[in-house]
C-alpha cells in the first residue's frame, strides 16, 4: 500500500526551522521518497516564526503549485493563545477572523483545531461550539482529537469520546499518533478507528509514530510496525493524509554517526 498512498507534507517534519527553509527540506525529501508530495502542505506550530501575508506571498511565489494550510496552533498573531474547540470569548472571534482571512489567501478552505480541555467546557458544549464556528465561518473548521495528558483533562481523549466525535456529525481530523497513545492506555479498537477514517466527516489524517506515551512525532520507517497502517485504505478519496514525522531526528542521528566515523 505504501506505493499507492499519496502522503502530503507538513513543516512539522523539520521542526525549529523557519517556514521557507523547512519547505526547502521538504522539497528535497519528496525527491527521495515517492510517497511524499507537496500538492498540499500544512504550516505547523513547530516551525519558527509567524504566518502572515508576507510569508504566504513568498511561499506562493516559490511554490505556485502548492496549497498551504494553517495547522492547529500555528502562530498567526504575536502574543495570542491558540484557539481550541473549547475556546470562547471576544478574543476567539478576533483570532478566527484573522485565521479565516489568511486561509482565504491560501485558497485551501479548511483549518483544523485541537479539541480543547474540560476546564473550558464540556464535550457536548465543545461540539456545539464547533458547529457554531462552522456556521459563522465560510471555511471548514475541523476538530482534531487528543489523548490522555498528565496535567490537564483533554476533550476527545479516549475511545468513548472518539465514538462521540464520530456521532457528532461535525468535520474532524484524525491524528493516528494520538490514537496510538489512546490504544496504549485502553487497548485497540480497530473497528472504531476504521469507522473514524471511513467517515465523510474525516477531512484529514496525520501520520507519525510514537511509543504510546508521548506525541513524539517519530518517523515511521516501515509501515508494518504501525498497527493503523492497513486501516488507511478505508479513508475517503477526498481525505488528505499528512506526514508529521520529525525527520530532523534522523538528520541528527546521521550527523552523530558521521562524527563517530571521522574519529
Q: PLM features: residue spans?
A:
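Acidic-and-aromatic substrate-binding clefts and catalytic sites of carbohydrate-active enzymes
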Residues: 13-22, 42-58, 76-91, 117-124, ...
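Short acidic, glycine/proline-enriched helix-loop-strand junctions
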Residues: 64-69, 136-139
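A cross-family glycoside hydrolase active-site/sugar-binding cleft signature
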Residues: 8-12, 41-46, 69-75, 112-114, ...
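Histidine-acidic metal/acid-base catalytic patches
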Residues: 2-11, 16, 20-34, 63, ...
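Active-site acidic/histidine proton-transfer and metal-coordination neighborhood
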Residues: 79-174, 227-229
Amino acid at each position: 500500500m505504501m506505493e499507492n498512498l499519496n502522503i502530503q507534507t507538513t513543516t512539522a517534519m523539520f521542526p525549529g526551522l523557519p517556514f521557507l527553509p523547512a519547505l526547502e527540506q521538504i522539497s528535497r525529501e519528496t525527491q527521495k521518497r515517492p510517497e511524499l508530495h507537496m500538492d498540499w502542505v500544512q504550516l505547523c506550530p513547530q516551525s519558527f516564526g509567524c504566518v502572515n501575508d508576507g510569508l504566504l506571498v513568498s511561499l506562493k511565489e516559490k511554490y505556485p503549485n502548492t496549497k498551504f494550510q494553517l495547522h492547529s496552533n500555528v502562530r498567526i498573531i504575536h502574543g495570542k493563545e491558540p484557539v481550541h474547540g473549547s475556546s470562547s470569548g471576544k478574543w476567539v472571534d478576533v483570532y478566527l477572523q484573522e485565521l479565516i482571512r489568511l486561509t482565504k489567501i491560501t485558497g485551501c478552505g479548511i483549518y483544523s483545531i485541537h479539541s480543547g480541555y474540560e476546564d473550558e467546557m464540556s464535550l457536548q458544549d465543545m461540539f456545539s461550539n464547533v458547529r457554531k464556528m462552522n456556521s459563522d465561518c465560510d471555511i471548514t473548521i475541523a476538530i482534531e482529537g487528543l489523548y490522555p495528558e498528565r496535567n490537564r483533562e483533554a476533550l476527545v481523549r479516549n475511545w468513548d469520546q472518539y465514538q462521540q466525535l464520530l456521532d457528532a456529525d461535525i468535520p474532524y481530523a484524525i491524528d493516528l499518533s494520538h490514537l496510538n497513545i489512546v490504544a496504549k492506555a485502553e487497548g485497540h479498537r480497530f473497528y472504531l478507528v476504521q469507522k473514524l477514517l471511513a467517515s465523510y466527516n474525516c477531512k484529514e489524517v496525520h501520520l507519525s509514530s510514537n511509543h504510546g506515551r508521548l506525541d513524539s512525532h517519530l518517523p515511521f520507517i516501515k509501515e508494518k510496525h504501525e498497527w493503523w497502517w492497513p486501516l488507511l485504505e478505508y479513508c475517503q478519496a477526498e481525505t488528505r493524509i499528512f506526514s508529521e514525522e520529525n525527520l530532523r531526528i534522523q538528520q541528527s542521528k546521521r550527523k552523530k554517526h558521521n562524527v563517530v566515523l571521522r574519529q
